[in-house]
Curated annotation (Swiss-Prot):
Residues 51-248, 319-468 form the Cupin type-1 domain. The keyword Lipid biosynthesis does not apply. Hexamer; each subunit is composed of an acidic and a basic chain derived from a single precursor and linked by a disulfide bond. SMART domains: Cupin_1. GO terms for molecular function: nutrient reservoir activity. InterPro entries: 11S_seedstore_CS, 11S_seedstore_pln, Cupin_1, RmlC-like_jellyroll, RmlC_Cupin_sf, Seed_Storage-Functional. Gene3D superfamilies: Jelly Rolls (2.60.120.10). Residues 280-300 are annotated as: Disordered. The lineage of its organism: Eukaryota, Viridiplantae, Streptophyta, Embryophyta, Tracheophyta. Seed storage protein. Belongs to the 11S seed storage protein (globulins) family. Residues 1-24 form the signal peptide. This is Glutelin type-A 2.
């Protein structure tokens, strides 16, 4: 009997482990390889033979903010499969709950506030009971009838430099409780495998209405209404157990405040007292560095999530990319580079995107490189940079200056070089792969360092000495390069040879 059951037990255990691993990969959206992607390919006919710097071409005003739209009808946006929006939320402004058909990364350029992504099926872990004033003397039975309870899912406080990850179809809202406007750039990947609709961004409003940005050339103003507008008030009343009057309020038929509304008296939200105290004392940054930079790195640094480390409901949705202590590479004379990918920010497995923040000092140069497995959407946050991009035919497809507020799309495999101007430069690059990789041409861990000297000498018809210089002039630098002249390179090389 035991000999008969042993193979069955072994088969059952193997089947369970296989299914459990598959479930974990589905939950975390993890690709089987860094080289693979779940994105759809670009439409046929995409040539990428002329790149350009983009700025918002139109804006839509709401009661308490502005939504600025980039020209997503441009071929470059359509070929890379991304949509970009910049939002300005004024103090006490509330971005109404909505969800999108594509996964998004949000970078907070300025300001601070609160956001609340709502994940389906997750519990409302923030709970509190209130009692109306003047009820303390009532009996227990009477008191219960005068109590009401508020509960909601976890809310997240954000600040300047945070990257917020929003999976496709996850509703979220945002509130500015600071004293300056919140400025945020939203990059949505509509070619993501999670989007099974047509390849264009669709925002589904749960509240309010907004002006249609596509109608800016028309004489008649058009509005996009929220999802409840299409249902009858009778069905809404029955579904929610509310009156017809309240059901009509859900439809917001006469609400022209837009998607960002003003909360005159501010929001009353459940928040842990310690978080508020940390914010008031200005200690949030150091606390986050200890908790997220130390503990979280040791927990997830292996890059092998098993489905138990971080569940769907408790995933961190934000990470600060501006913190200098998080820099992956740093040159005190040139700048720093910080990467966010699924290894240190696991929710990016669901979003299938990643981000890189680059800070270049005065006249510093970023090593020429190409993106191996992703398109790159570069947004300048500070300063100016001279940028050149070259395609597979050796043709310069972009040669110009990028300044603050401008955006450049760099296609996969195209070679790019960036040089900061006198005031320096800072930018964030959104990548269409959760584990984006680049191949540097110069410096440490570069292509030239990996090639034999004789290969370089014969490939470029130069002497072996020149080939050695080509390999080692930037041999001690990685990523951000110090602005040196050729003579300085030669002096450094001669000193190294003599020693």
């Amino acid at each position: 009997m035991a000999s008969i059951n042993r193979p069955i037990v072994f088969f059952t255990v193997c089947l369970f482990l296989l299914c459990d691993g598959s479930l974990a990969q589905q939950l975390l959206g993890q690709s089987t390889s860094q080289w693979q992607s779940s994105r759809r390919g670009s439409p046929r006919g995409c040539r990428f033979d002329r790149l350009q710097a983009f700025e918002p071409i139109r804006s839509v005003r709401s009661q308490a903010g502005t939504t600025e739209f980039f020209d997503v009808s441009n071929e470059l946006f359509q070929c890379t499969g991304v949509s970009v929006v910049r939002r300005v939320i004024e103090p006490r402004g509330l971005l109404l709950p909505h969800y999108t058909n594509g996964a998004s990364l949000v970078y907070i350029i300025q300001g601070r506030g609160i956001t609340g992504p709502t994940f389906p099926g997750c519990p409302e872990t923030y709970q509190q009971q209130f009692q109306q004033s003047g009820q303390a003397q009532l009996t227990e039975s009477q008191s219960q009838s005068h109590k009401f309870k508020d509960e909601h899912q976890k809310i997240h406080r954000f600040r300047q430099g945070d990257v917020i990850a929003l999976p496709a179809g996850v509703a979220h809202w945002c509130y500015n409780d600071g004293e300056v406007p919140v400025v945020a750039i939203y990059v949505t990947d509509i070619n993501n495998g999670a989007n099974q609709l047509d390849p264009r961004q669709r925002d589904f409003l749960l509240a309010g209405n907004k002006r249609n940005p596509q109608a800016y050339r028309r004489e008649v103003e058009e509005w996009s209404q929220n999802i409840f507008s299409g249902f009858s008030t009778e069905l809404l009343s029955e579904a929610f157990g509310i009156s017809n009057q309240v059901a009509r309020q859900l439809q917001c038929q006469n609400d022209q405040r837009g998607e960002i509304v003003r909360v005159e008296r501010g929001l009353s939200l459940l928040q842990p007292y310690a978080s508020l105290q940390e914010q008031e004392q200005g200690q949030m940054q150091s606390r986050e560095h200890y908790q997220e930079g130390g503990y979280q790195q040791s927990q997830y640094g292996s890059g092998c999530p098993n489905g138990l480390d971080e569940t769907f409901c408790t995933m961190r949705v934000r990470q600060n990319i501006d913190n200098p202590n998080r820099a992956d590479t740093y040159n005190p004379r040139a700048g720093r580079v910080t990467n966010l990918n699924s290894q240190n920010f696991p929710i990016l497995n669901l979003v299938q995107m990643s981000a890189v923040k680059v800070n270049l000092y005065q006249n510093a140069l970023l090593s020429p490189f190409w993106n191996i497995n992703a398109h790159s959407i570069v947004y300048i946050t500070q300063g100016r940079a001279q940028v050149q991009v070259v395609n597979n035919n050796g043709k310069t497809v972009f040669n110009g200056e990028l300044r603050r507020g401008q955006l450049l799309i760099v296609p996969q495999h195209y070679v790019v070089v960036k040089k900061a101007q006198r005031e320096g430069c800072a930018y964030i690059a959104f990548k269409t792969n959760p584990n984006s990789m680049v191949s540097h041409i110069a410096g440490k861990s570069s292509i030239f360092r990996a090639l034999p000297t004789d290969v370089l000498a014969n490939a470029y018809r130069i002497s072996r000495e020149e080939a050695q210089r080509l390999k080692h002039n930037r041999g001690d630098e990685f990523g951000a390069f110090t602005p040196l002249q050729y003579k300085s390179y030669q002096d450094v090389y001669n000193v190294a040879e003599s020693s």
